Amino acid sequence: MVLSIRSQIIIGVVSSILLTSTILAIAYILMWFNGHMTLTLTLTTIITSCLTLLICSIFINPLIQKIKQFNIKTKQFANGNYASNDKTFNSPKEIYELNQSFNKMASEITQQMNQIKSEQQEKTELIQNLAHDLKTPLASIISYSEGLRDGIITKDHEIKESYDILIKQANRLSTLFDDMTHIITLNTGKTYPPELIQLDQLLVSILQPYEQRIKHENRTLEVNFCSEIDAFYQYRTPLERILTNLLDNALKFSNVGSRIDINISENKDQDTIDIAISDEGIGIIPELQERIFERTFRVENSRNTKTGGSGLGLYIANELAQQNNAKISVSSDIDVGTTMTVTLHKLDITS
């Protein structure tokens, strides 16, 4: 049987009183007091001890009540009621400090739970959006494939157009799966080794796959180095992905025949390199510029399949930048264009 604190204290006090009274009674007898005096002293001792017990109970009772309140609060917390956070918990110092520590723990757990719920909601919306985005290219691929198989599409120009659409939708699927792969790996703590980067060579390797598209869309793309930049150490893999996503974004949200500029500058005092990708696209209104890197946000403020992709490119780029010693900033004017600037901090591999 587990005794309550009240019972243990009372038993302790009563035992102490009985022991003290017994010892005093024996002492009175040994002192050769007469019977009347011995009885008087013994009764006085017992009465005094009872008063002590009463006073002790008066002081102990509020403490017991506070402990009961604290026990109720911990049970509520254990049952998922994280809002039961009594800030006006008056009690002795030790119990007060215990309550403050509990409140702090409850507050932190509540914040973590809210964050988990928010992230779970975002993930649910993300999966729903991606599932919807996957249906469109899949339906298109199935439709045109069946048309080619069943002989419905027979004219040469229609066949060529169908193949072009199939390739386009297959590329779109590839982009969607690529985005999903990066979303999954973003929060796994994966690290990349620093590599020596020659920036002009890196840009050539990034821009080469876009050569045919730029020619086909009659675009102008210029790369400008403000000064000669020596090779430096950075995380190559995430940097390639960041620049690719920003370039994709510039191409998606600007018109065919428009201009794309990539300007590179170096700040030797801060040991940083800025890579600015500018387009002549639709632009972003100021109140939305802070939100464009959110996981569930798209510039059009709707899931417009016209631009293709999942709308996750900027989110992925920003997350990779934050995780790999870089930063992305944005400046934009409506119907003028947008500039995305990646600020790279050179890595000191000797430290």
UniProtKB/Swiss-Prot annotation:
Highest taxon listed in the record's lineage: Bacteria
Main location: membrane
Membrane topology recorded in Swiss-Prot or TrEMBL: Multi-pass membrane protein
Enzyme class: transferase
Domain HAMP, chain residue ranges per copy: 61-114
Residues modified as Phosphohistidine: 132
Post-translational modifications: Autophosphorylated.
Keywords: ATP-binding, Cell membrane, Kinase, Membrane, Nucleotide-binding, Phosphoprotein, Transferase, Transmembrane, Transmembrane helix, Two-component regulatory system, Virulence
Catalytic activity: ATP + protein L-histidine = ADP + protein N-phospho-L-histidine
SUPFAM superfamilies: ATPase domain of HSP90 chaperone/DNA topoisomerase II/histidine kinase (SSF55874), Homodimeric domain of signal transducing histidine kinase (SSF47384)
GO biological process, one term: cellular response to phosphate starvation
Start and end residues of each Histidine kinase domain: 129-348
Molecular functions per Gene Ontology: ATP binding; phosphoprotein phosphatase activity; phosphorelay sensor kinase activity
Residues passing through the membrane, by range: 9-29, 40-60
Role, per record: Member of the two-component regulatory system SaeR/SaeS involved in the regulation of staphylococcal virulence factors in a strain-dependent fashion. Probably functions as a membrane-associated protein kinase that upon sensing the appropriate signal, autophosphorylates and in turn activates the cytosolic response regulator SaeR.
PANTHER family: PHOSPHATE REGULON SENSOR PROTEIN PHOR (PTHR45453:SF1)
Name of the protein in question: Histidine protein kinase SaeS
